[in-house]
Amino acid sequence: MPLNVSFTDWNYDLEYDSVQPYFYCDEEENFYQQQQQSELQPPAPSEDIWKKFELLPTPPLSPSRRSGLCSPSYVAVASFSPRGDDDGGGGSFSTADQLEMVTELLGGDMVNQSFICDPDDETFIKNIIIQDCMWSGFSAAAKLVSEKLASYQAARKDSSSPSPARGHGGCSTSSLYLQDLSAAASECIDPSVVFPYPLNDSSSPKPCASPDSTAFSPSSDSLLSSTESSPQASPEPLTLHEETPPTTSSDSEEEQEDEEEIDVVSVEKRQPPAKRSESGSPSAGGHSKPPHSPLVLKRCHVSTHQHNYAAPPSTRKDYPAAKRAKLDSGRVLKQISNNRKCASPRSSDTEENDKRRTHNVLERQRRNELKRSFFALRDQIPELENNEKAPKVVILKKATAYILSVQAEEQKLISEKDLLRKRREQLKHKLEQLRNSCA
């Protein structure tokens, strides 16, 4: 851990020293000073302002975060692997074996040739990417790794131990190498930040199985133990997969937010998603956010009854008036009860719509009853009995005239009845006189 802190501070100082001419106007002529000595490099921005954009069209891929397997430091460690006798155990590898192991671990397509060059090469130092302020940390990391390897090599020469002990010490030294390399790899740029989409279409990583990988079991065991014991290493055990960008905390948070999408159709609260297992890493609990599930309204289907006003009314029904009124009242009450069965939080607009709908139903019932009354009145008038298209005004006039005529006939019949009663009384009195005279 102290090595990592000192490396970070030293890296920041180195980057500040490399980009210090950027912040002073009087030193603008010294921009890309080493590039002016080479004819192959583009000119400084002071000569032509548009020449400073002549970088690579696409930035190179950042070093992989999988314990620094693709970085040049891993190649240096592989070349500096402790060697012993041929019968000394699993730590004795020849140069051909080491190259074969690197080829099997990384694969021919995954090895970037720009990262396997010598860090001390002159072309590597004069590279514009190394001198750029954004990519200068890579050269600093490589230089730091080379210095550490030189110090470890000097310490290895000073130590004198027998071959079995030397083999065990070689494993521990390689574990220290991998620990420092994993710490340096953690300072690299995450490829998922630069490239948000994976480089290949494989959704799940597949382990690279090779029959010759079992020959290097001791070194792989030491690699796993050193990776698990290192605090800067990833919490998962080191496995060889295809080159896919690792899942960071931001990606996990985005996946969790995608799982918490709200269903706007249902009124029930969405159950919080299952908590992720805490066995992955102890820092995973710090990134987890409490799921929020707001209450949403449920869609309510309001049934509306459509009536065909153009259809002619059925006037020749044999139903009595009382029975028809009872059926219509029952139908209206059923419609009102169905309209009130809307199971949703009622607002002022909903209540107003219900009142308007109820008023329309009652008004329609009143008009139908009035129309049936006119039809019944038309049937009672002798002149309009067979006229189904008689207007209401004619029905009212004919009904009034018919009522007046009926009333006049009634008065005539009442007066005639009175005359007949008087005649009856006279006849009864005359009959009594005749009986008395005969007696």
Curated annotation (Swiss-Prot):
UniProt GO MF annotations: DNA binding; DNA-binding transcription factor activity, RNA polymerase II-specific; E-box binding; protein dimerization activity; protein-containing complex binding
An annotated GO cellular component: nucleoplasm
Sequence motif: UBR5-degron, positions: 355-364
Compositional bias segments (type: Acidic residues): 251-263
Ranges that cross the membrane: none
Compartments reported by the entry: Nucleus, Nucleoplasm; Nucleus, Nucleolus; Nucleus; Cytoplasm
Polar residues biased stretches: 335-347
Annotated coiled-coil segments of the chain: none
Residue ranges of the region described as Leucine-zipper: 413-434
UniProt crosslink position (Glycyl lysine isopeptide (Lys-Gly) (interchain with G-Cter in SUMO2)): 52, 143, 148, 298
GO terms of biological process kind: chromatin remodeling; chromosome organization; DNA damage response; G1/S transition of mitotic cell cycle; intracellular iron ion homeostasis; MAPK cascade; negative regulation of apoptotic process; negative regulation of cell division
Keyword Ribonucleoprotein assigned: no
Subunit and interaction comment: Efficient DNA binding requires dimerization with another bHLH protein. Binds DNA as a heterodimer with MAX. Interacts with TAF1C and SPAG9. Interacts with PARP10. Interacts with KDM5A and KDM5B. Interacts (when phosphorylated at Thr-58 and Ser-62) with FBXW7. Interacts with PIM2. Interacts with RIOX1. The heterodimer MYC:MAX interacts with ABI1; the interaction may enhance MYC:MAX transcriptional activity. Interacts with TRIM6. Interacts with NPM1; the binary complex is recruited to the promoter of MYC target genes and enhances their transcription. Interacts with NUP205.
Protein name: Myc proto-oncogene protein
Organism annotation: Galeopterus variegatus (Malayan flying lemur)
